[in-house]
Amino acid sequence: MTNMRKTHPLIKIINNTFIDLPTPSNISSWWNFGSLLGLCLVIQIITGLFLAMHYSSDTMMAFSSVTHICRDVNYGWLIRSLHANGASMFFICLFIHVGRGLYYGSYMMVETWNIGIILLFTVMATAFMGYVLPWGQMSFWGATVITNLLSAIPYIGTDLVQWIWGGFSVDKATLTRFFAFHFILPFIITALAGVHLLFLHESGSNNPSGLNSDSDKIPFHPYYTIKDIFGVLFLLLILLTLTLFYPDLLGDPDNFTPANPLNTPPHIKPEWYFLFAYAILRSIPNKLGGVVALVLSILILILMPLLHTAKQRSMMFRPISQCMFWLLTADLLTLTWIGGQPVEHPYIIIGQLASILYFTIILCLLPIAGLLENYMMNWK
């Protein structure tokens, strides 16, 4: 009798995705982050659902409802802390996942890569709207500053901002619609992740060598299920340590104060995972130029398949490209640091230089390094 796992229409899909999937035998721990992102998404949806049961999206009630969750709801403090720090873990995994794709040339699977970029934008939008919901000082002013950037769009900018706000300032209408979008977007992200997997399994996984691995494949289960479980335990250890010992480490102290439109905080800044993009935005004195640079800082990833000049797919055997990659990593960490600093000397010039370097590495230095390595190996 044929195994039900291989014949049943629904179970067959799960089987072909997580059990009998032919997988390269040499993929390293850097390939664990896809499954960890799936775990983060599940954690966020479950904790978010329980938070939504007790949250009120009214400007008069939002801050109090979050306080009520933390004080009066059974394990509400834990659910809220898991949700807030789960977002940080989500972005750590996202950045490593994208970095892995850049390092090992996974962007050559164009459809998978492009869906991944759409996913990145969607997750960033969801996180931004979620940050507004507690209705603290930084929530309110962060929402005001970031949504106001759309007014830089010629002709339609001002109307667009007022349309998003639902009035002439960030108010009740804004909070209500942000809550609605924040609730629905994770389910859209889940659907997009399914499409991401669909495209990935059309071509099969890449591997550290960047070579075709058809001759050396192993089943996903039990080898990579066990490996993924190890990654899951490690992620949960970090998340629970952060949640139970340092729950407010990555938050902003200003968000313990209820939103006050009459009092602007001295330094408006987003959550830590947006600081690199915020630093690029601030480094350009022109409003429209800053907004364009902000969008391009992520959108530039779409160009990666076009900018690939090397004859080898992976950077595993390309030392010059490796140097460029780690320079880019250091530059992004510098931008993250600068984004959290006040707008004054010497931070302004450091931010401008780091922003220029970011675009220079991606658009010029990485393609040049690829050509140089081709020449050094006589692959003209």
Swiss-Prot record:
Segments passing through the bilayer: 33-53, 77-98, 113-133, 178-198, 226-246, 288-308, 320-340, 347-367
Gene: MT-CYB
Assembly notes: The cytochrome bc1 complex contains 11 subunits: 3 respiratory subunits (MT-CYB, CYC1 and UQCRFS1), 2 core proteins (UQCRC1 and UQCRC2) and 6 low-molecular weight proteins (UQCRH/QCR6, UQCRB/QCR7, UQCRQ/QCR8, UQCR10/QCR9, UQCR11/QCR10 and a cleavage product of UQCRFS1). This cytochrome bc1 complex then forms a dimer.
An example molecular function term from Gene Ontology annotations: metal ion binding
Presence of keyword Membrane: yes
GO biological process, one term: mitochondrial electron transport, ubiquinol to cytochrome c
The name this protein goes by in its record: Cytochrome b
Cofactor note: Binds 2 heme b groups non-covalently.
Residues holding heme b b562: H83, H182
Similarity comment text for this entry: Belongs to the cytochrome b family.
Membrane topology: Multi-pass membrane protein
More info: Heme 1 (or BL or b562) is low-potential and absorbs at about 562 nm, and heme 2 (or BH or b566) is high-potential and absorbs at about 566 nm.
Subcellular location: Mitochondrion inner membrane
GO cellular component: mitochondrial inner membrane; respiratory chain complex III
A Pfam family reported for this protein in Swiss-Prot or TrEMBL: Cytochrom_B_C
Role: Component of the ubiquinol-cytochrome c reductase complex (complex III or cytochrome b-c1 complex) that is part of the mitochondrial respiratory chain. The b-c1 complex mediates electron transfer from ubiquinol to cytochrome c. Contributes to the generation of a proton gradient across the mitochondrial membrane that is then used for ATP synthesis.
InterPro entries for the chain: Cyt_b/b6_C (IPR005798), Cyt_b/b6_C_sf (IPR036150), Cyt_b/b6_N (IPR005797), Cytb/b6-like_sf (IPR027387), Cytochrome_b (IPR030689), Cytochrome_b_C_euk/bac (IPR048260), Cytochrome_b_N_euk/bac (IPR048259), Di-haem_cyt_TM (IPR016174)
Cofactor list: heme b
Binding residues annotated for heme b b566, in chain numbering: H97, H196
Binding positions (a ubiquinone): H201
Keywords, sorted A to Z: Electron transport, Heme, Iron, Membrane, Metal-binding, Mitochondrion, Mitochondrion inner membrane, Respiratory chain, Transmembrane, Transmembrane helix, Transport, Ubiquinone
